[in-house]
Amino acid sequence: LKILDDVRKKYNVKTLTDIHIPQQAALASKSTDILQIPAFLSRQTDMLSAAASTDCIVNVKKAQFMSAEDMTNVVNKLKHYKAKEIWLTERGTTFGYNRLVVDYTGMLIMQKTGCPVIFDATHSVQCPGGMGTSSGGNREFVEPLAKAALSDGPNMVPLEEFEGMLKRVLSKS
């Protein structure tokens, strides 16, 4: 947490960190600007309540087993607990075994909540367990998915690990 705090002060940027138990929210909120709720914890009321009770932005990653419509319940819980600002992240939906797919209409549905929507193109190409003994992915699909997402209008597209991709995607728009 000290490193996150140092980075945000030195570079004047917002920092983000996951929390995994409700008790981490208060401590993490002193050192970061955005508390992120991991996908598999995204329906846990105690996690949402703890994150909302801070002054941080709360970013919730949509679990692969949830529909876009289910995120309305998440947003309503966060609003009930007076979250300062809420972001939602689309990361793909489970499609059979070893496959995630992206339903772009889901981003439009989530935008109806009034919250900014982030599209995580790198997670969306993941193939959980797809290598037999480990997870794999299809990097060649990251750029086309990100470009398609930009045309559908998510508010943010994080492009971690892919140097220069944002420039290429935007130049093709």
What are these regions (language model features)?
Residues 12-15, 36-38, 94-97, 134-135:
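Short, flexible loop segments at the rims of nucleotide/cofactor-binding pockets, characterized by
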